[in-house]
Structures are given as C-alpha cells and as structure tokens.
Amino acid sequence: MAKKSAIYGEYVVSVKDDGAIEVFRNYDNVKGSLREIAESKGFAYDPSWNTQQFGARLIKEFGEGSEAHVDNYVIVKKDNGHIDTYRTYENTKEALRSISSATGFEFDSNWTTRQMGSKLIDFLNNLNNK
C-alpha cells in the first residue's frame, strides 16, 4: 500500500508505508516493451506474434504461472489474457531526477531520495490538478 502517489505519463511515483520511495513505469506500448525485454535477454521472437502470444511465451520462458520477473521488468498475464508490463528502477533517485527534468520540478541536490520523492509527488499532484 502507498501513503501517497502520483502519475506522470507512464510513470508512477509512490511513498510506501515504510516511507521508501518506489518508481515504476507502466508501459503504454506493451509490445514494444516485450521486444525490449526479449532483446535484453537474447530471446528469439517472431515479429508476427501478437501481444498476448509474445507475453505468454516470455512468461513461460522466464516466469511461472501468470507472471515473470526479468531483471527490472515485470510481465503479467491477466485472467482475460491481457498482458501488462512495467519496469522498476534500481536507482530510484536517478529515476526521480529524470521525471523532475521532464516536468520542470526543481530539486535540491542535498535532498535524500525520500525527501525528493515526497516533494516530487506533491508537485506532480499539484500539476495534475491544474
């Protein structure tokens, strides 16, 4: 569960219950993200596969059941067959800097990841409410 969160484009920034900051990217272009995942692992694929076929094959190769974790990527097959992909970030502060740069959010380089994440969430929520 998250104490607070904000969405910017494909990115979600959250303050978790323990105060840690989490950033993930929920891909709009799922097939493109599946290609990115496959290529990062040297997984051969057929360009004619649809998103459901592609996702199911990657899950079979790298996961189990309806989910696969491939490095920082997660592939999920929903009950209706729909495939979702998202990416987490090892370097949370770098992801926060990237989002800050894209949104015009000015930050203090001395802020901790928790400070920066919390303030960025407030900024994004204010931006979204305008």
Positions of predicted regions on the chain:
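Short, charge-rich amphipathic interface segments used for partner binding and complex assembly
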Residues: 120-121
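Short acidic DE-rich linear segments
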Residues: 127-130
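Acidic, low-complexity, intrinsically disordered interaction modules
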Residues: 16-20, 24-57, 61-109, 114
